[in-house]
């Protein structure tokens, strides 16, 4: 099984990153092929930690500044690498970018993982809601409030 864990914020010293890294370490220890996708250039100590734990790293640029270019780069990467699962970690329906890329690339399981109860981009969040709903087929939340906020009345797991 090949799993791609995507961070929609910078991979570094923050809560979402800690969750992703700890999850990746656990998966790798169980001999699962796991890759973390970062939207920033990751510092050397963190790269070394991932490598030491047999975790692959793919750095992407432009999620916020060039989202269409980012979408196609991610989609092409997904097609080339044939992941079974894409697990996107974020705070809003802007995860639709990654989920639609995964759906377009033929990834069977596309998980959105909600880590918050608000967004800094309410208009974009509302605009992307239909694409998000179309593309997601697995729903996780770090707590009940985060799940209710992002997934509304849809079923999700904490």
Task: Give the positions of each predicted feature.
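Membrane-interface segments of envelope glycosyltransferases acting on lipid-linked substrates or membrane lipids
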Residues: 1-158
């Amino acid at each position: 099984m090949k799993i791609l864990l995507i961070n929609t914020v910078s991979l570094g010293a923050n809560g979402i990153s800690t969750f992703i890294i700890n999850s990746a370490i656990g998966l790798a220890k169980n001999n699962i092929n796991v890759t973390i996708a970062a939207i920033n250039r990751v510092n050397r100590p963190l790269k070394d930690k991932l490598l030491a734990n047999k975790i692959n790293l793919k750095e992407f640029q432009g999620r916020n500044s060039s989202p269409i270019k980012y979408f196609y780069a991610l989609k092409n990467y997904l097609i080339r690498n044939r992941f079974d699962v894409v697990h996107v970690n974020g705070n809003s329906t802007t995860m639709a970018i990654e989920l639609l890329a995964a759906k377009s690339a033929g990834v069977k399981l596309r998980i959105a993982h909600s880590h918050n109860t608000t967004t800094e981009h309410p208009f974009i969040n509302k605009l992307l809601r239909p694409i998000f709903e179309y593309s997601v087929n697995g729903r996780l939340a770090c707590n009940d409030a985060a799940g209710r906020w992002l997934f509304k009345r849809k079923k999700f797991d904490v």
